[in-house]
Curated annotation (Swiss-Prot):
Tissue specificity of this protein: Abundantly expressed in semen (at protein level).
Protein name, entry field: Interferon-inducible GTPase 5
PANTHER family hit by this protein: INTERFERON-INDUCIBLE GTPASE, INTERFERON-INDUCIBLE GTPASE 5
Reactions the enzyme catalyzes: GTP + H2O = GDP + phosphate + H(+)
GO MF: GTP binding; GTPase activity
Subcellular location as annotated: Cell projection, Cilium, Flagellum; Lipid droplet
A GO CC term assigned to this protein in UniProt: sperm flagellum
Classification via InterPro entries: G_IRG_dom (IPR030385), Immunity-related_GTPase-like (IPR007743), IRG (IPR051515), P-loop_NTPase (IPR027417)
Annotated organism of origin: Homo sapiens
Role this protein plays: Required for sperm motility and therefore male fertility, via positive regulation of spermatozoa fibrous sheath formation.
Record domain IRG-type G: where: 53-235
UniProt-annotated binding residues for GTP: 62-69, 87-91, 169-171, 216-218
Length: 463
């Protein structure tokens, strides 16, 4: 994710990890002061903030490439519909303009001015549109990939980011070729010629495996437009907490390892939130959130690792195998369905692990053990989610190996994280002397401080 601040789409809140940390800090303060109604309010804000992190997509290319028309087509809008991007024969985009994606409200398509247009000369374009702020790009061209497109592609690569190359107005190319060579005209051959030329130019710019889509914005049902939409949806999973990372293809072992590490942090936060909910004397709050949040989290892990039916079917198609063959190596009890019954069974099996987790945290926060003993479900939730995450990560690795088994042998690399996100695997240490009794609010405040300090330490190490 880009960390620089982008202009906020009017009427929408910009949800970021930083804001989640700020809410968690406010939650800790409310607990320590004993203000339970305020704590409940902050808790609900925290839950909402973890559900979405924005993904900013820059739609770039030269003036007249059809960027605005492509955005409208992707959003299912005509040029005259309310909220449609402005289109025209002259350059209509003078500054970056945001448009929300209809199926993914946390994804914003940014209509960027034309590269090399009078308002954005080539030598100032990258700085003027703040090119580095976008997470992903649609590089749009109305011709067979010239100097403007290769320069933009090289810049995207320099930033370590990805893009789709969208070649627009292929209907005009086909019509012109049909007129010029009526006797030997073959549509498929002309389209392949265009695709090959674009691929060659992009490879010359350093793009090893360019993703090329030939479209007509005026005929979105034809050519590669349906494939562009399905690829787009596949690469933008509904799990929005780590949008940029989670859109990486699951075929990559490195991607699996990164996904597991990121989701492991989410396990700790989810367990914390549910533990806090259990401690709040707010009638009905725990019942309303427990099952729903657990199921939501587990389904998110399931989709993120590509273990759902749609992801398996698409992967099977890509590698020329049957989806059933890939599914056969999945061992997790959540392979078929993440149901309330399955979650309850797994939750009930987590009591032993819960005590180990509680003892581990008790070494860092001596009062934590009494908090767990008082009925807090933190340990059981953490143990269950951690176990499910481990199983799904290993399943994703087995699926990857199965998908590639006809290629070079793939060693089954363990995806275990050494320290379970800071929770050691040993027993509890020797306790000290007697401590003065602390209120539940104070205990929860200490726990939240522990989590915040861990995050701050992690951030400082990354810097």
């Amino acid at each position: 994710m880009a960390t620089s601040k982008l202009p906020v789409v009017p009427g929408e809140e910009e949800n970021t990890i930083l804001m989640a940390k700020e809410r968690l800090e406010a939650l800790r303060t409310a607990f320590e002061s004993g203000d339970l109604p305020q704590a409940a309010s902050h808790l609900q804000e925290l839950l909402a903030s973890t559900e979405s992190i924005r993904l900013e997509v820059g739609v770039t290319g030269e003036s007249g490439a059809g960027k605005s028309s492509l955005i409208n087509a992707l959003r299912g809008l005509e040029a005259e519909d309310p909220g449609a991007a402005l289109t025209g024969v002259m350059e209509t985009t003078m500054q970056p303009s945001p448009y929300p994606h209809p199926q993914f409200p946390d994804v914003t398509l940014w209509d960027l001015p034309g590269a090399g247009s009078p308002g954005c000369p080539a030598d100032k374009y990258l700085k003027q549109v703040d090119f580095s702020r976008y997470d992903f790009f649609l590089l749009v061209s109305p011709r067979r990939c010239g100097a403007v497109e290769t320069r933009l592609a090289a810049e995207i690569l320099c930033q370590g980011k990805k893009f789709y190359f969208v070649r627009t107005k292929v209907d005009e190319d086909l019509a012109a070729t049909r007129t010029q060579r009526p006797s030997g005209f073959r549509e498929a051959a002309v389209l392949q010629e265009i695709r090959d030329h674009c691929a060659e130019r992009l490879r010359e710019a350093g793009v090893a495996d360019p993703r090329i889509f030939l479209v007509s914005n005026l005929s979105p049902a034809r050519y590669d437009f349906p494939t562009l939409v399905s690829t787009w949806e596949h690469d933008l999973p509904s799990h929005r907490r780590h949008a940029g990372l989670l859109s990486l293809p699951d075929i990559s072992l490195e991607a699996l390892q990164k996904k597991k590490a990121m989701l492991q942090e989410q396990v700790l936060k989810t367990a914390l939130v549910l533990g806090v909910i259990q401690a709040l004397p707010v009638p009905g709050l725990a019942a309303a959130y427990d099952d729903a949040l657990l199921i939501h989290s587990l389904r998110g892990y399931h989709r993120s690792f590509g273990l759902d039916d749609d992801s398996l079917a698409k992967l099977a198609e890509q590698v020329g195998k049957q989806a059933g063959d890939l599914r056969s190596v999945i061992r997790s009890p959540l392979a078929n369905e993440v149901s309330p019954e399955t979650v309850l069974r797994l939750y009930s099996q987590s009591s032993d692990g819960a005590m180990r987790v509680a003892r581990a945290f008790e070494r860092g926060i001596p009062v934590f053990g009494t908090l767990v003993a008082g009925g807090i479900s933190f340990g059981a939730v953490y143990t269950m989610l951690q176990g499910c995450l481990n199983e799904m990560a290993e399943d994703a690795q087995r699926v990857r190996i199965k998908a590639l088994e006809d290629d070079e042998p793939q060693p089954e690399v363990s995806l275990e994280v050494a320290s379970d996100n800071g929770v050691e695997k040993g027993g509890s240490g020797e306790g000290g002397g007697e401590e003065a009794p602390l209120s539940t609010c104070r205990k929860l405040g200490l726990l939240l401080k522990y989590i915040l300090d861990s995050w701050k330490k992690h951030d400082s190490e990354e810097k």
